[in-house]
Structures are given as structure tokens and as C-alpha cells.
Amino acid sequence: AFIPRQRRQGFQFWKALGCTHDYNNSFYYSDEDVRLRWEGYDAIAQTREAQRYIRERAAGRPFTLFLSWGPPHAPYHTAPEKYRSRFRPDALAVRPNVPESDRQKAREVLAGYYAHIAALDDCLGDLLATLSEKGIAKNTILVFTSDHGDMLYSHGRQKKQQPWDESIRVPFLLRYPAALGPGGRTIDMPISTPDIMPTLLGLCGIEVPETVEGTDFSRVVKGESPAPDNAALICCPSPFGQWTRKAGGREYRGVRTERYTYVRDLDGPWLLYDNLADPYQLTNLVNRPEHARLQKQLEGLLKAKLTQTGDDFRSGWDYIRQWGYEVDDSGT
């Protein structure tokens, strides 16, 4: 829908996409309440607009640009042909936790998923090239991340919202040569989406307001402090869409530490995985006597996280009624 200028949270350049997942026929709104359409594959068209903004407006003054691509979200087989032709299903490996009965379907989906990713690889490369062209690549913070993963038939499951790693783990790449140097390194520490904004403020030398949720990890990123033993809060407030209650969807809260995943639903403890010993999460250790002490520790960590965020963990229907949402039969 059209978003008037006064509700755009300060953004001055605006081309907001309507969420259709029809990547070759998608629309957006700009400064007028007129529906416009992206030409061709929308991720490429959106990248070209971002490049145009950088060339025309960004050089010589600070800017923030937020570019949100739709792919590699389903539907999977809609990337341009030059990318789809690069991936043959029978040549692709699937994860060991994909059931044998789903392996061929998983390979077919992966071929399209990888094609979308290959297209985005080129788009990201084009953005970096434009930053270099304008002479601002070294002094620009670039973050590449995502809002969710995709089960892709691991554990016989599909799509998002679910507490397994294929769904909750997402890439987080941060590039800032002026402060971090030209080389790369890996920080083995879980973070959550609320941590991104305060960390970016820290990297910019801007004080983080006390009201901001999340943690400033800029000193960790710069190598000035060791990575703490952090835990990311994971949750599904109310199942919907592609993970309905009829399909086994449920409310849950959990924590993902560097080593463990612990999740409870409204009925109690649900999942416990040792991701170091069991990276494909094939063995659920929840409620086993020999892991009672570990489970108690993780339960305490989860309760602390919920207290910190003011989450009383009720049925999703309670929140829907409380906030006056209207949902269809799928919970959407």
C-alpha cells in the first residue's frame, strides 16, 4: 500500500515494494499514490535504483540506504534463465537431515533457491562496484543479512518460522574497511536482529539511546573486546501462513547459544540440541535425565531473556485479540 511521506520514518528516497513474491511482475509505490512496476526481475531492478541513488545523491555526505530483496524466498523457480541454467537438481547435495522420501523434491527446490542466490550475488557485487566507483567503499558500512532461512525439506519440513537452524540461522556479513581493515574474520557469537541497530550506532560513534532494545557489539566487531557468551532469543508469537496450526505450527520461545538450541512451547520443554555434537539436529535431548542440569540452565537463560523483553509468553490468539488484528483461517 502507499505510505505517505510523514509515515516513512525519515526516509527521503522511497520505492516501497508491495509484498507479492511475484519477482518478475512486482509493484511498488514512490512519492505518489500510484502503483508502479519494477521492470523484469525485481531484485535486479531494485539494485539498479540503489546504484542510481548512490551515484546521484550519496557521494560526499553520510547516508543510510536500506535495500530489501524478495528472493530467495519462494517461489523458487523464477530467477532469470541465465541463473537457473547453472544448477541441475541431480548434481546438488542435500543436507543429511533431509528424509530419503524428500530428497528429490529438495534437490529440485535447491536448484531454484541457488539460482535466486546467484542472482543476488551479482546484485551485491554491482552495489560494491558502485561504492568503489564513487570512492566511498572503504568508509561505508555494508551489512548483508536476512530475516529468516528456509527448511528446504530438512526434517521433512518446509519454509520458515520454525526453530531449527535451517529456519532461524541467517547470514550476517559486515564490511567496513576504514574501521575494521581489509581482511576478514569470523566471530562465533549469536546475535539477534535488535542488536544490529545499536551495533551500527556504535560503529558510527553515535550514542545508543537507553530505550533501544538490543546490545551494541561494536567493540566486539572491532576486536576491542572478546565475544561474550551470548544467546539469541528465538520465537514464534503466533503460527501463520506456511506453518499453520493444522500443519503443526505452534507458539514457542527459545534460545540459541553458540552450542545449544533450547525451545519450549506452551505445553513445556520441546527441543534441546547440542549443535556441536549434532550439527544437523537429529537427536532431541529434551527431558532426558542425563541432561537435566543443562536443560535447567538453558531454561533459566530463556526466562531471563523473556523477562528482559517483557514477554509473558501467552497463546498467539491472546495477542491477536489484544492488538486488534484480523487474521484469516491460516492465522495470516
Model-found features: residue ranges?
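Short, structured coil segments at secondary-structure junctions
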Residues: Q9-G10, I168
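Active-site-proximal cap/lid insertion segments
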Residues: L17-I44, Q51-P194, G202-T211, R264, ...
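WW-domain-binding short linear motifs
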Residues: P228-C235, I320
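Short, P/G- and charge-enriched loop/turn segments at secondary-structure junctions
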Residues: R157-Q162, F240-W243, G248-E251
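Basic phosphate/pyrophosphate-binding loop/patch that engages nucleotide-derived ligands
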Residues: Q6, A58-A59, S132, V220-N230
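Low-complexity, glycine/alanine/valine/leucine- and proline-rich hydrophobic stretches
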Residues: A247-P269
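Short, acidic/polar N-cap/turn motifs at the starts of alpha helices
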Residues: F2, N25, E251-Y252
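Long, internal low-complexity/basic segments
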Residues: L285-T332
